[in-house]
């Protein structure tokens, strides 16, 4: 596929309103038909998105958390189950059809990161106290708990589920074997803290975003850095590979989202935004990029509570 085959320049963003405060996290379900958004307003919402359809989306509110919903993720094997991590110390599992909470567990601290194992059996949760908890999805009970003596940020499994990655405030990526959680490797990735990590859906690469404003691309088989993406000037808060693994989106406090070609490192498009971004995520089936940030209403200086999706042929 040539770089020029996706006409990014002619594609549009649509705005989705519903939250009362800013949106911290956006995530697509496994078949790309639903998007979940988590907000400081203590709710998550489920949106049915038609990739080629009109922009009127009916949404479903998930209520129950008593603090900010900081991150959420969908069960990779079930397109109607979504897990939310909140500052209220709980993790909840929801049915996106009914909007009901089906499972919940109270953990020891304010939860800020959550990710599913690719086979859907386990969920990893990270909190503000640098503690990692692995939950068994069936029983929704902790299997492992591990406290680290350094800042732990975003976490991820590789596709086969035998490696577990931690990004750290030391500028390293810790690679642990799974399920033993024994250290395998420490990758000196950046000159400042590493904040976010994304796994290429084809399983070849992972990417790391850092406070040094760079995104690094790594070969997952030999753990070597292949290249860096240098367009952003502020700490990188969020990154995502598109479904084919050809493009990577990255965002920060810069007022644009960078979309780069993974193979060449070249920027192919930039999406202008009005505020620092908290979350970007590509749809797993289509070139639709959901993004959410600290948007304010300019008149009242209040949170707008919106997110947007880029990639539609009409606005």
Swiss-Prot record:
Taxonomic lineage of the native organism: Eukaryota, Viridiplantae, Streptophyta, Embryophyta, Tracheophyta
GO cellular component: Cul4-RING E3 ubiquitin ligase complex; THO complex
Cross-referenced InterPro entries: G-protein_beta_WD-40_rep, Tex1/THOC3, WD40/YVTN_repeat-like_dom_sf, WD40_repeat_CS, WD40_repeat_dom_sf, WD40_rpt
UniProt-listed GO biological process terms: mRNA export from nucleus; mRNA processing; regulatory ncRNA-mediated gene silencing; RNA splicing; ta-siRNA processing
Ranges for the WD repeats: 18-57, 64-104, 106-145, 189-228, 231-270, 272-311
Signal peptide interval: none
Gene name per UniProt: THO3
Disrupted-gene phenotype: Developmental defects as well as reduced levels of endogenous trans-acting small interfering RNA (ta-siRNA).
Organism: Arabidopsis thaliana (Mouse-ear cress)
SUPFAM superfamilies referenced in this protein's UniProt entry, alphabetically: WD40 repeat-like
Sequence similarity: Belongs to the THOC3 family.
UniProt entry keywords in alphabetical sequence: mRNA processing, mRNA splicing, mRNA transport, Nucleus, Repeat, RNA-binding, RNA-mediated gene silencing, Transport, WD repeat
GO MF annotation terms: RNA binding
SMART domains: WD40
Subunit structure: Component of the THO complex, which is composed of THO1, THO2, THO3, THO5, THO6 and THO7.
Top-level lineage group: Eukaryota
General function of this protein: Acts as a component of the THO subcomplex of the TREX complex which is thought to couple mRNA transcription, processing and nuclear export. Contributes to the integrity of the endogenous trans-acting small interfering RNA (ta-siRNA) pathway. May process or transport a long RNA molecule so that it can be a template for secondary siRNA production. May participate in the trafficking of siRNA precursors to the ARGONAUTE catalytic center. Required for the generation of functional messenger ribonucleoproteins (mRNPs).
Protein name (record): THO complex subunit 3
Compartments (UniProt record): Nucleus
């Amino acid at each position: 596929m040539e770089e020029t085959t996706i006409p990014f320049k002619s594609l549009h963003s649509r705005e989705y309103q519903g939250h009362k405060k800013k949106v911290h996290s956006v995530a697509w379900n496994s078949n790309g038909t639903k998007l979940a958004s988590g907000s400081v307003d203590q709710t998550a919402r489920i949106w049915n998105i038609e990739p080629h359809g009109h922009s009127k989306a009916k949404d479903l509110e998930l209520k129950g958390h008593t603090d900010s919903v900081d991150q959420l993720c969908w069960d990779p094997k079930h397109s109607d189950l979504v897990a939310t991590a909140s500052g209220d110390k709980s993790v909840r599992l929801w049915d996106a059809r009914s909007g009901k909470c089906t499972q919940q567990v109270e953990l020891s601290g304010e939860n800020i990161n959550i990710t599913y194992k690719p086979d859907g059996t386990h969920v990893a949760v990270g909190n503000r106290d640098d503690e990692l908890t692995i939950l068994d999805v069936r029983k929704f009970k902790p299997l492992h708990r591990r406290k680290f003596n350094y800042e732990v940020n975003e976490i991820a499994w590789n596709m086969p589920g035998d490696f577990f990655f931690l990004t750290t405030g030391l500028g390293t990526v810790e690679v642990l074997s799974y399920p033993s959680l024994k250290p395998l490797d420490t990758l000196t990735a950046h000159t400042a803290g590493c904040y976010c990590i994304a796994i290429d859906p084809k399983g070849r690469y992972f990417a790391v975003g850092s406070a040094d404003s760079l995104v690094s691309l790594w070969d997952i088989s030999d753990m070597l850095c292949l290249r860096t993406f240098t367009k952003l000037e502020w700490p990188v808060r969020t990154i995502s590979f598109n479904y084919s693994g050809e493009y990577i989106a990255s965002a920060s406090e810069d007022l644009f989202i960078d979309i780069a070609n993974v193979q060449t490192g070249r920027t192919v498009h930039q999406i202008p935004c009005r505020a620092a971004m908290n979350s970007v995520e590509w749809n797993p089936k289509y070139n639709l990029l959901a993004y959410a940030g600290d948007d304010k209403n300019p008149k009242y200086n209040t949170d707008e509570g919106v997110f947007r999706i880029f990639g539609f042929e009409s606005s």
